[in-house]
A protein has these predicted regions:
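Patatin-like phospholipase
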Residues: 1-275
C-alpha cells in the first residue's frame, strides 16, 4: 500500500486479471514472485546458539515461536527475488507510517523496522518474509533477522497504544472456529488463541478490532502448504469473496439517498399515516 498500489488490484495481480491504470503503472511490468527454488538439505546446527544459551538460563523469557526460530537450522532458500522487487519500488523509507515486524536471531527480540530503527525497505520486508527453518535469515547491519511471525503471527499488539478507531487484521493462519490440533492445523490452534488475547487487549484500550480468519471452506481451498505457488490464484479469488462477505456482514450496505428523495422532517408535527 505504501507504494501507492491500489488494494483492489491485489487479487487481479495474483490471478492474472486486468489491473487499474495505477496498478499497471506500479507493478505492471514486475514479474510475479515464483515459488521458492528447492534448497540443499539444511544443516543440523541451530540457527541461534546464542539464544539457546540464554534460554537455558531464563527459558520463561522466550515465546515458543521465537525459541523455535533459534532451535531450527537456518533455512537454505533465499529471498533475493523479494528483495529485488521491493528495491525497485522504494529508494527510501516512506514518509507515511510503515512498520515491518521481524525477530532478531541473536537474542529473540522483536524489532519493528520503521518504529524501532530504519533499514532499506527491501531488506526489512525480506527479513519479515524469512520463515525460520525455510528461508535463510536476512542480515541487516551485521544482525540476522527472520519473520516477525515467530513472535506473533499477526503482531496486533504493536498497535495497542496508538489510540486508533479501527484495526483490520488479516489472519490467514487463524480459524473462525476451534479446529482439531492435527498436523494440518498445528499453527491454527495457537494462532487463534493468541489473536483472541491480543484482540481483547487492543479492544480494552478502546480500539475496535475486526479480524478476518478463514472458515472451514476457505481453509480447504488454502490447504496445508502455504508456499504452494499453484494455490495462489484459487486462494486469492476465494479469499476476496470470503472477505467481502465478512465485511458485508460487519457493515451492511446502505444505498446512498437520492438527492431527489426528500429527507424526513426532523422537527415539528409528523405526518399522519392514513388508514
Amino acid at each position: 500500500m505504501r507504494t501507492g498500489f491500489p488494494p483492489e488490484d491485489y487479487v487481479p495481480r495474483v490471478a492474472g486479471q486486468p489491473m487499474s491504470a495505477q496498478g499497471e503503472a506500479i507493478l505492471g511490468t514486475a514479474p510475479q514472485l515464483r515459488a521458492p527454488a528447492p534448497a540443499a538439505r539444511a544443516g543440523h546446527r541451530p540457527a541461534s546458539p546464542e539464544m539457546l544459551r540464554a534460554a537455558a538460563r531464563r527459558p520463561w523469557r522466550y515465546r515458543p515461536g521465537v525459541l523455535a526460530s533459534g532451535v531450527l537450522p537456518e533455512g537454505r532458500r533465499d529471498v533475493t527475488a523479494t528483495a529485488a522487487l521491493f528495491a525497485s519500488l522504494f529508494d527510501a523509507w516512506p514518509t507515511d507510517p510503515l512498520w515491518v515486524c521481524t525477530v532478531r536471531l541473536r537474542d529473540g527480540a522483536r524489532v519493528v523496522f520503521g518504529r524501532d530503527q530504519l533499514a532499506p525497505v527491501a531488506d526489512a520486508v525480506s527479513a519479515s518474509c524469512a520463515v525460520p527453518g525455510y528461508f535463510a535469515p536476512v542480515t541487516i547491519d551485521g544482525e540476522r533477522y527472520v519473520d516477525g511471525a515467530a513472535y506473533s503471527l499477526t503482531s496486533l499488539d504493536v498497535v495497542a497504544d496508538l489510540e486508533l478507531d479501527l484495526v483490520l487484521v488479516s489472519a490467514p493462519m487463524g480459524s473462525t472456529e476451534t479446529v482439531a490440533p492435527d498436523i494440518g492445523n498445528a499453527l491454527r490452534v495457537p494462532a487463534r488463541a493468541k489473536l483472541a488475547r491480543e484482540a481483547s487487549h487492543v479492544r480494552g484500550r478502546g480500539t475496535r478490532v475486526l479480524a478476518i480468519q478463514p472458515d472451514r471452506r476457505l481453509r480447504a481451498v488454502m490447504g496445508t502448504n502455504t508456499m504452494s505457488a499453484a494455490k495462489r490464484r484459487p486462494v486469492a479469488l476465494a479469499t476476496r469473496e470470503y472477505a467481502a462477505g465478512v465485511l458485508r456482514e460487519e457493515w451492511p450496505f446502505r444505498p446512498p439517498r437520492s438527492a431527489a428523495t426528500p429527507r424526513p422532517p426532523t422537527g415539528g408535527p409528523r405526518p399522519q399515516r392514513s388508514h
